[in-house]
């Protein structure tokens, strides 16, 4: 015990330290705030799909401290960009979430803070170790990397035959509206991304998902028709995400408006799924991660070194 204490005092075996931890009262989602060795803060989320430890368990990891993309509906973008995370810092999120929660997840999504494809090398290294038989031994089908549309990295990902699932944050098919909410549109237009995917993606073995945050101004019948024209092949799946509350100043759609949009897409045979927003009450859902301590009831653990 004396030796263990001396080692703990002199050496750190983890790249991150637990700063805060909070549990959703709605659905069992758990959010973790970690501190890096140089004093930055990042967040990870454990999503219990059916609210228990028995069903699908997904860990959402961050790839950057902050984010440089500035998407209007995302709290992370308001922080600005600090730096890329190292592979060890990405992997440590998974290690610590598993250790602290006592569960073994079966899915990982790179959908936390940051733009994964602006940290391409480190993200791919971390994903490879997650898949490696002497690492976490997760199936490549259980690892998903999301991007807002960094065209050169998407092409590189496909050309290198990376086996992981790919998710594109689409959110608008109208380039004018998309540029208003997603500045990346000005550099890498979604029409160009769609052309690349149409040319190269069908011959790859990857699964492609388009993520679409439903706002009140992007779920019209014309939006549905543009979606069908732009992605007219059956090898994509559209994942619809209701806009979550935040200080973005955008109007949330009603259930009736979202249902009508879903029906418009289904009539046109667009493969659609609707993502349940997990952890809304703890600011742990899509677009809500801000790298700050949570100040409300529901906390399960606070502070301490992991």
Where do the PLM segments sit?
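Flexible, acidic/Gly-rich N-terminal and inter-domain linker regions that tether
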Residues: 1-57, 301-306
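Short linear Ser/Thr-Pro motifs
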Residues: 24, 62-63, 146, 169
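Canonical Radical SAM [4Fe-4S] cluster-binding loop centered on the CxxxCxxC motif
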Residues: 50-89, 96
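Conserved AdoMet/S-adenosylmethionine-binding subsite of the radical SAM
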Residues: 98-107, 112-275
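A short, acidic, flexible beta-alpha connecting loop/helix-capping segment that sits on the rim
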Residues: 276-282
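C-terminal catalytic core of tyrosine-transesterase DNA break-rejoin enzymes
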Residues: 290
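Secretory/periplasmic and organellar redox-cofactor proteins
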Residues: 295-299
């Amino acid at each position: 015990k004396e030796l263990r204490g001396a080692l703990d005092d002199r050496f750190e075996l983890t790249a991150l330290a637990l700063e805060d931890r909070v549990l959703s009262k709605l659905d069992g989602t758990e959010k973790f705030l970690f501190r890096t060795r140089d004093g930055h803060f990042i967040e990870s989320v454990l999503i219990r799909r059916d609210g228990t430890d028995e069903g699908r368990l997904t860990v959402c990891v961050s790839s950057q401290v902050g984010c440089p993309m500035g998407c209007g509906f995302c709290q992370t973008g308001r922080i600005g960009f600090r730096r890329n995370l190292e592979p060890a810092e990405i992997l440590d999120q998974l290690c610590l979430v598993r250790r602290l929660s006592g569960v073994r997840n079966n899915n990982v999504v790179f959908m936390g803070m940051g733009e994964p494809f602006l940290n391409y090398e480190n993200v791919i290294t971390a994903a490879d170790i997650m898949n490696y038989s002497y690492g976490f031994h997760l199936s490549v089908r259980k690892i998903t990397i999301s991007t807002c549309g960094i065209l050169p990295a998407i092409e590189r990902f496909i050309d290198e035959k990376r086996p992981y699932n790919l998710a594109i944050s689409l959110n608008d098919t109208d380039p004018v509206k998309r540029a208003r909410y997603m500045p990346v549109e000005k550099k890498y237009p979604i029409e160009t991304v769609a052309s690349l995917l149409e040319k190269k993606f069908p011959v790859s073995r990857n699964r492609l998902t388009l993520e679409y945050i439903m706002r009140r101004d992007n779920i019209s019948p014309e939006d549905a028709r543009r979606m069908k024209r732009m992605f007219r092949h059956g090898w994509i799946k559209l994942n619809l995400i209701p806009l979550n509350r935040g200080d973005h100043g955008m109007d949330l759609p009603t259930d009736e408006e979202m249902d009508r949009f879903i029906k418009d897409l289904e009539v046109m045979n667009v493969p659609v799924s609707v993502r349940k927003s997990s952890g809304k009450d703890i600011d742990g859902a899509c677009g809500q991660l801000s790298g700050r301590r949570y100040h409300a009831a529901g906390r399960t653990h606070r502070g301490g070194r992991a």
